[in-house]
Amino acid sequence: MPKAVRITHGNLWANIESMCAAADLRAGRDVMVSWLPLFHDMGMVGFLTLPMCRGIESVCVTPADFLSRPLLWLELVSRYGGTCTAAPNFAYALAARVLARADGLDLSSLRFALNGAEPIDVSAVQGFLAAGERFGLPPTAVVCAYGMAEATLGVSFHPWGTPLQVDVLDAVALETDRRARPADPGAPAGSVRTFPVLGPPLAGIEVQVRDPQGAALAEGGVGVLHLRGDSVTELYLSVDGPRPTRDADGWLDTGDLGYLSGGRVVVCGRVKDVIIMGGRNIHPTDIERVALQVEGVRAGNAVAVRYVPAGRRESFAVGVESREAGDPAAVRRIEDGVRSAVTAEMGVRPALVAVLPVGTLPKTPSGKLQRSAAAALLDRLTAPN
């Protein structure tokens, strides 16, 4: 059932103040560039309300403008001397590809390019930074972040002006023991999982990690992230009336999995998306990363979801888009390639691999994958007539 998040003036102002402090945003110096939709919290709060409240210059176009010509985003940064921007992870992967064919840009002014609103792929960040290097893009420009509407917007930002920090974890410890244990040096790719390390919680926000029984975990324990603070909402508004969001001690259950590392937040995924097989808690983003490496799979267009075939135990399905979806031989090759690659690297075999035409996977107006809708789509494709 749809529900709205009630954000008070106090919530809003507390979050704007803490984000401006973390990003060191200043009127008269900074120029914010955005194509984000204004009906989404990142665009509405971060790139409309915040610059209006703080008197910061803002340059905005629509998501349709960006999706029809992605290079426009970076052309605006170059033209107006943009210092701050933000986008979901897929946009940075897309930008890396268009930058490879671009000329005449100056990205040296961009000091704060926030990556958030969906799972962050470290390789996408690194690819964007590498592609932008010849245009003067600072190597510390990308700021990996975590936020949610229930916290108004921002929860944790990687400290700007510092290099990307990545945790390389032992997959067995993560998926079986729910521990963030560093992988052994030289461990094969299939036995490790990588996550960007964010920053400490923004000022005025506390983060606690809890196990399935609700007990607080020490650093390195992987569990559900809980939030408390001035920018965290107290109520959902639904057709049945207001619903409290916090427990008796003021903590909000985010539904996100993660851990703390040196007081810094690391996000692993969503509880509802985790695929449980053989006692392992497998994050779909790890499966998607492998599937995207298969020849013929369209960049940024793969999804892994829970899947329970009739009469069988829980497994998972993988859907990928391909420009070759109309060629039966190519479809078989891609299906076999995805199945083999995922099995080899992840140690689990998908029950279903579906090769779909371009534009099939459901996405938001800003281009983010809608995982639950994709799961329903794959169910429909395999349902008996």
Protein language model regions, located:
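Conserved C-terminal "lid"/linker of ANL adenylate-forming enzymes
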Residues: I275, N301, V305-R306, A317-V318, ...
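AMP-binding/adenylate-forming catalytic core of the ANL superfamily
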Residues: S78, T85, G229, E234-L235, ...
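Alpha-helical scaffold elements adjacent to nucleotide-binding pockets in ATP/GTP-utilizing enzyme cores
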Residues: N11, N15, F47, L72-L76, ...
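Gly/Ser/Thr-rich phosphate-binding loop
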Residues: G82-A86, V98-S191, E206, Q213-A215
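Conserved AMP-binding/adenylation subdomain of ANL enzymes
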Residues: W13-V31, D41-T83, V98-A102
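Conserved AMP-binding A3 loop
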Residues: M1-A14
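Phosphate-coordination loops involved in phosphoryl transfer and adenosine-cofactor binding
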Residues: G28-R29, L110, V222
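Conserved ATP-binding/catalytic segment of the ANL
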Residues: F195-Q208, P212-G220, V224-P284
